[in-house]
Design a protein with these regions (language model features):
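Juxtamembrane/interface motifs at transmembrane-helix termini
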Residues: 36-40, 89, 114-116
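Short, intrinsically disordered, mixed-charge
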Residues: 19-29, 64, 116, 124, ...
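Hydrophobic ligand-binding cavity/cleft-lining segments
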Residues: 1-38
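A conserved amphipathic terminal alpha-helix motif
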Residues: 99-131
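Ser/Thr-rich, low-complexity intrinsically disordered terminal regions
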Residues: 44-45
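Hydrophobic-ligand binding "helix-grip"
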Residues: 48-95, 99-101, 124, 128-129
Length: 131
């Protein structure tokens, strides 16, 4: 299993950062890696890449303005994502960890670098909304 973690200090107030990250229906507007996201229920949503490739997310824990966790799965991988949000004055520290298991052995050597790239882009997209 590959594990990747990223931490960053976002120049925005905790409630605003939390609200942006959890505004799933508008992911297509601010996430550069997605074409859209579809909310299926209050515990399930699907993200679609620019090429239309779906990944399903199932909420496992939500502690408002503190912690958000979900399981994720597509044809290539299964995993778990944990997001921790901490107020630091007028800024917000984010601490995101992904644990992913590749379903196809050919993909296993590339999972860690792919996760790192995805996390870096996600944080960059969040930052763009607060710079």
């Amino acid at each position: 299993m590959a594990i990747s973690n990223i931490k960053a200090l976002i120049p925005g107030e905790l409630h605003k950062v939390w609200d942006l990250v959890l505004d799933i229906e508008n992911y297509g507007a601010w996430r550069s890696d997605l074409s859209k996201a579809e909310v299926i229920s209050d515990k399930k949503f699907i993200e679609y890449t620019k090429d239309g490739y779906p990944t399903t997310f199932t909420l496992t824990l939500a502690e408002p303005y503190r912690r958000w966790e979900f399981d994720m799965e597509n044809n290539n991988m299964t995993g778990h994502w944990t997001g921790i949000f901490t107020a630091k004055g007028d800024e917000t520290e984010i601490d995101f960890t992904e644990q992913v298991e590749a379903k196809k052995w050919l993909l296993k050597p590339f999972v860690k670098s792919y996760l790192r790239k995805q996390q870096t882009q996600f944080v960059a997209d969040i930052m763009k909304n607060f710079s």
